[in-house]
Amino acid sequence: MNPNFLDFEQPIADLQAKIEELRLVGNDNSLNIGDEISRLQDKSKTLTESIFGNLTSWQIARMARHPRRPYTLDYIENIFTEFDELHGDRHFSDDAAIVGGIARLDGQPVMVIGHQKGREVREKVRRNFGMPRPEGYRKACRLMEMAERFKMPILTFIDTPGAYPGIDAEERNQSEAIAWNLRVMARLKTPIIATVIGEGGSGGALAIGVCDQLNMLQYSTYAVISPEGCASILWKTAEKAPDAAEAMGITADRLKGLGIVDKVIAEPLGGAHRDPVAAAALIREELSSQLAMLKEFDNDELLARRYDRLMSYGL
């Protein structure tokens, strides 16, 4: 199967394969088959709109994990200028599962922090598949406190299955690192905007997700546990993951309806991986607009608004 397509996209993949075959035939024989290619392209677009207009929660969860989906560094490259990555937590080491540094958005200095997964096997291992250890969260905390000190807004990108549950992480007090970040972010006297770009997994996501404005990409997810994990607990089998995904309400639209998410950012047709540059442009537009809005509040108003936002969850 074409790695650019998931199994429920197979009809689209078949049409795209036919289009590529026709292009090759046309190149080899100098035949004018442009009309047929255009017809198939229109058919592919219509089919894509039909499939993506009716995705289940489980299908959206799989889209959030798509191996071609843009990651934090992809968005940094396409949204910001003059990015200067900063390293280390000043306690133990540098965690490559969290990237962060100073950049400019519309000429304004900002602190950008996000989870980073990895493409190839070696990079996946180096970045621990996007699952931070305590030093990753402590690095993020250090950068956020730096941002407050220099009056820079904080922009975070969330994309993790969850915090790393290994013994070494627990020995270095993973839960304390996450809890400390929640405490610090709730009190930071600078605007914070968080955007879920893929998986928003449990406390590992929330540790850089306390904010004044929460965005989710159209095909991202945000939940306290993975659908497979939930299914394993409730039904004793991960095969019930589709049912768990539906019951948990993990999608952007469901969470927007609950008042947890402020803005659902549309993705290009077929998902952000089909057109990463266009996806980045949509995020950039929203970030610029939200930063301008948050600048209208002084520090006391910002903190009061953030507190009210957090206390409204579950009401």
From Swiss-Prot:
Q: Which molecular-function annotation in GO is an example for this chain?
A: acetyl-CoA carboxylase activity
Q: Which PROSITE patterns match?
A: COA_CT_CTER
Quaternary context: Acetyl-CoA carboxylase is a heterohexamer composed of biotin carboxyl carrier protein (AccB), biotin carboxylase (AccC) and two subunits each of ACCase subunit alpha (AccA) and ACCase subunit beta (AccD).
Organism of provenance: Pseudomonas savastanoi pv. phaseolicola (strain 1448A / Race 6) (Pseudomonas syringae pv. phaseolicola (strain 1448A / Race 6))
Name the UniProt record assigns to this protein: Acetyl-coenzyme A carboxylase carboxyl transferase subunit alpha
Pathway field of the UniProt record reads: Lipid metabolism; malonyl-CoA biosynthesis; malonyl-CoA from acetyl-CoA: step 1/1
E.C. number:
2.1.3.15
Q: Which principal EC class is assigned to this enzyme?
A: transferase
Q: Which NCBIfam families match?
A: accA, AccA_sub, PRK05724.1
GO annotation, cellular component aspect: acetyl-CoA carboxylase complex
Major localization listed first in the record, in broad terms: cytoplasm
Q: Reaction(s) catalyzed by this protein?
A: N(6)-carboxybiotinyl-L-lysyl-[protein] + acetyl-CoA = N(6)-biotinyl-L-lysyl-[protein] + malonyl-CoA
Q: Which Pfam families match?
A: ACCA
Arranged from A to Z, the UniProt key words for this protein are: ATP-binding, Cytoplasm, Fatty acid biosynthesis, Fatty acid metabolism, Lipid biosynthesis, Lipid metabolism, Nucleotide-binding, Transferase
